[in-house]
Amino acid sequence: MTEPTVGSTDAELLAEPRLVVEPGVAARVSAVAGPVLQGMGYRLVRIRISGEAGCTVQIMAERPDGSMQIEDCEAISRALSPVLDVADPIDRAYRLEISSPGIDRPLVRRSDFERYAGHLVKVEMAVAHEGRKRFRGMIGAVEGDRVHLQRDDVKAGEERNVLLTMEDISEARLVLTDELIAESMRRGKAAAREMRRNLGLEPPAAPHAKISEKTTKNTKPKKKPAPTNTKKHRLAAERARRGEIEPDEGD
C-alpha cells in the first residue's frame, strides 16, 4: 500500500472542517482521531458508537479523492489504536472498526455536497427547518455553508425547494440509485488508475506515430535524365565515326 501523497489541493481538502459532526462521546473520539487521520493523509468522515453485542466504535475515513482500500483501513487501525488507548475517550471496553464511507455515504463537508450535486439525499436535521426535521430530495447548489435541496417528498402546500444550513444537519446520507452506483464506479476506476500510475504500474501512453521524413521534406521532384538514344544522337555518332564532327555534338 502506498501512503496518500499530499499535494496543494489535497492539503486543502484535508484541512476542510466537517460541518456535520457528532455529539457526546463520539465527539471526544473525533477530537483524538481527527488529527491522527489528517497527519496520515486521510479525512475523518464519521464516528458512530453502538452498544449492540458490546461497544463498537466505527470510524469512517477516506483519502482526499474519496477512495479507501482495505490496506488503508488496516494502516489507520494500527496507528490509531494505541493513541486511543492513551487518550481513553471511552470509559469501557470497545472494539475499533475502521471502514470506508461506502456508496450511500454520509455527507459531512461542504465539498461533499458540491461533489454529489444532482444526487438524491436523505437529511435529518438537528435543528428543525420551518418546523420540519426530515427531508429527502436532489442536492442543488451550495451557498456558503447552506445547501439547496429540491424535495421529492413534498406535500400539498409545502415548498419544493429548501435551503438548509449544514451545521443544523445531524445526518445527511446519499440514497442508493443507479446513477449513484454508476458515478461511484467511474470514480473508483479513476482512483485505481491514479494509484497504478503512482506505483509505476500504469502502462505508458502509446507513442504518437512519427511521420516519415520523406513525406515532410519540401523537396522538388528530381529531373529525369535526358535521353541519350535519340535519332539526333545516332546521326551525330555516325558522323563522328566518319570524322566529320566532334563526338559530343549530340548532347
UniProtKB/Swiss-Prot annotation:
Pfam families: DUF150_C, RimP_N. GO terms for cellular component: cytosol. Keywords: Cytoplasm, Ribosome biogenesis. GO terms for biological process: ribosomal small subunit assembly; translation. Transmembrane segments: none annotated. Residues 235-245 have a biased composition (Basic and acidic residues). Residues 217-234 have a biased composition (Basic residues). Residues 198-251 are annotated as: Disordered. SUPFAM superfamilies: YhbC-like, C-terminal domain (SSF74942), YhbC-like, N-terminal domain (SSF75420). It comes from the Bacteria. It is found in: Cytoplasm. Required for maturation of 30S ribosomal subunits. Belongs to the RimP family. PANTHER family: RIBOSOME MATURATION FACTOR RIMP. This is Ribosome maturation factor RimP. It comes from Bradyrhizobium diazoefficiens (strain JCM 10833 / BCRC 13528 / IAM 13628 / NBRC 14792 / USDA 110). The lineage of its organism: Bacteria, Pseudomonadati, Pseudomonadota, Alphaproteobacteria, Hyphomicrobiales.
